[in-house]
From Swiss-Prot:
Family designation: Belongs to the ATP-dependent DNA ligase family.
Provenance organism: Pyrococcus abyssi
Protein name: DNA ligase
EC top class named in words: ligase
PANTHER family (alphabetical): DNA LIGASE, DNA LIGASE 1/3 FAMILY MEMBER
Residues annotated as the enzyme's active site: 249 (n6-amp-lysine intermediate)
Keyword DNA damage included in the entry's annotation: yes
The keyword Repressor is annotated on this UniProt entry: no
Length: 559
């Protein structure tokens, strides 16, 4: 299958904002895809190369990409860089360079999708001494044979800046439409495996029956079950039917642990493989988890010198560290508090009631200094739960989780079977979708940022406000450096940014607002932290903001 067919799909997707049209375009394309291509083409359609849990990264920045294009076209790198000032898009500038190509091989052959994919895999797997030169040559070989439209989208794939508006929800619907299978079965299979390539292939070859049989696989992380927030203990107990399991809510990073014999793999909440960054936890898991094969979930917490928990950002620092890991182990010791088990020795437990899963967890875990089971309390008594809540806060934790005793595990769902109880309104994780340049001495820096909440139905990010407070000068330097390559267009001081970066913000309150399409606006938002553990589709949704608005009004006594 030729790559130009995929490039033309990208172009059509870019030209329409209508979700139904996009879905039909992707579905019609998937129908034509050979079976052996289905394992990777869904990721290319999303603008990726690998699933989010795959450790491999392309490791190619703008400069290396431009050098590869220069090598392929004979056009000076500086000329390509300068062209971006006119086009506003490196992909467009690369397409123009390829159009003006000064040299083309006599042996040039049309690009196939498989060749492009295999080359990108080779780029990702090339490491060590001289790897940058090798990566450049691999990419240059693609650009030598590429048509301008192909070059544009190869470049965008490499940089992760596709801009076609295809998100997980749209791809799910397109798979359902293409292969005439139930959308809820596609959703379920994806939530259990986090692998659209696998799901698309099953949908085509085995249909609804095959999708219904999909189950958990060690090595493919499950989309985590999520919680809503309750106003207080009393409301949580009422929602749970009068009795609940209360657990300490740790201020850490949620992880999913897959054990397969002596092999342990640990995934972040965003399903990224963080195993190499936390070797001491890997060893502790081998000792603590008795079964040969298991999948468990827990909260990874950084511990201070006083034995109290440190803010979750310290755990993220551990995740980011690729070198001098032993030094970081000393500086930021970690502790894993397990709270659920999803799979043991070939048996999926997600359809098992929560209390049975909790008992199973206690049976299979032998706690040690690094791995523990989350402290809990089962009660019908409000006062007893209040005392437990108070103690959790005094110990430096965030609050409590309340869990329905008979709840099954629902991957990817944010329902009311799990509830958070915290002393303040929940902070929001939102995507930066635009920004404004600063003034005076900060004129060269982005100074305030437009915040977007995710709409899973359309794949859009709808504006809910602008944040400019809470940032240090160093923060603004870092954000400007991070966001500059993601700028889509500029108009005066305002820039539009590709939705990639998630930040956590606090705010005074949520207001209803006709000013924004979202219907909501944040009053006095303030920057708290960069959420590197979350991708744009993990950001808070419009529905979530509506729920928090209702909760806020209940806490005020207005509802």
């Amino acid at each position: 299958m030729r790559y130009i067919e995929l490039a033309q799909l990208y172009q059509k997707l870019e030209k329409t904002t209508m979700k139904l049209i996009k879905t039909r375009l992707v579905a019609d394309f998937l129908k034509k895809v050979p079976e052996d291509h289905l394992e990777f083409i869904p990721y290319l359609i999303l603008g990726d190369v690998f699933p989010e849990w795959d450790e491999r990264e392309l490791g190619v920045g703008e400069k290396l990409l431009i050098k590869a294009v220069s090598m392929a076209t004979g056009i000076d790198s500086k000329e390509i860089e300068n062209s971006v000032k006119d086009t506003g898009d490196l992909g467009e500038s690369i397409a123009l360079a390829v159009k003006r190509r000064k040299q083309k091989s006599f042996f040039s052959q049309p690009l196939t999708i498989k060749r492009v994919y295999q080359t990108l895999v080779k780029v990702a797997e090339t490491t060590g001494e001289g790897s940058q030169d090798k990566k450049m040559k691999y990419l240059a070989n693609l650009f030598m044979d590429a048509e301008p439209i192909e070059a544009k989208y190869i470049a965008r794939t490499v940089l992760g800046t596709m801009r076609t508006g295809v998100a997980e929800g749209l791809l799910r619907d397109a798979i359902s439409l293409a292969f005439n299978v139930k959308v809820e079965l596609v959703e379920r299979a994806y939530m259990l495996t986090s692998d659209f390539g696998f799901v698309a292939k099953i949908a085509k070859t085995e249909g609804n029956d095959g999708l219904a049989k999909v189950t958990i696989q060690i090595g493919k992380p499950i989309k985590p079950m999520l919680a809503q927030q309750a106003a207080n203990i009393k409301e949580a107990l009422l929602e749970m039917g009068g009795e609940a399991e209360f657990e300490i809510k740790y201020d850490g990073a949620r992880v999913q642990v897959h054990k397969d014999g002596e092999k342990v793999t640990i995934y972040s909440r965003r399903l990224e493989n963080v195993t190499r960054a936390i070797p001491e936890i890997v060893e502790a898991i081998k000792e603590a988890l008795k079964p040969a094969k298991a999948i468990v979930e827990g909260e990874l917490v950084a511990i201070g010198e006083d034995g109290r928990p440190l803010p979750f950002q310290y755990v993220l620092r551990r995740f980011r560290r690729k070198y001098n890991i032993e030094e970081m182990m000393e500086k930021i010791p970690l502790e894993l508090n397990l709270f659920d088990v999803l799979y043991v020795d070939g048996v999926s437990l997600i359809d098992t009631k929560f209390m049975e899963r909790r008992k199973k967890l206690e049976e299979i875990v032998e706690a040690n200094g690094k791995v523990k089971i989350a402290e809990n309390l089962i009660t019908k008594n409000v006062e007893e739960a209040e005392q437990f809540y108070k103690r959790a806060l005094e110990m430096g934790h965030e609050g409590l989780m309340a869990k329905r005793l008979d709840a099954i595990y629902e991957p990817g769902n944010r329902g009311k079977k799990w509830l958070k109880i915290k002393p303040t309104m929940e902070n929001l994780d939102l995507v930066i979708i635009g920004a404004e340049w600063g003034e005076g001495r900060r004129a060269h820096l982005l100074g305030s940022f437009i915040l977007g909440a995710y709409d899973p139905e359309t794949g859009e990010f709808l504006e809910v406000g602008k944040v400019g407070s809470g940032f240090t000068d160093d923060d603004l330097v870092e954000f400007t450096k991070m966001l500059r390559p993601l700028i889509i267009k500029e108009e005066g001081k305002r820039v539009w940014i590709q939705p990639k970066v998630v930040i956590e913000v606090t705010y005074q309150e949520i207001q209803k607002s006709p000013k924004y399409r979202s219907g909501f606006a944040l009053r006095f938002p303030r920057y708290v932290a960069l959420r590197e553990d979350k991708g744009p589709e993990d950001a808070d949704t419009i529905e979530r903001i509506a729920q928090l608005y209702e909760l806020q009004e209940r806490m005020k006594g207005k509802v």
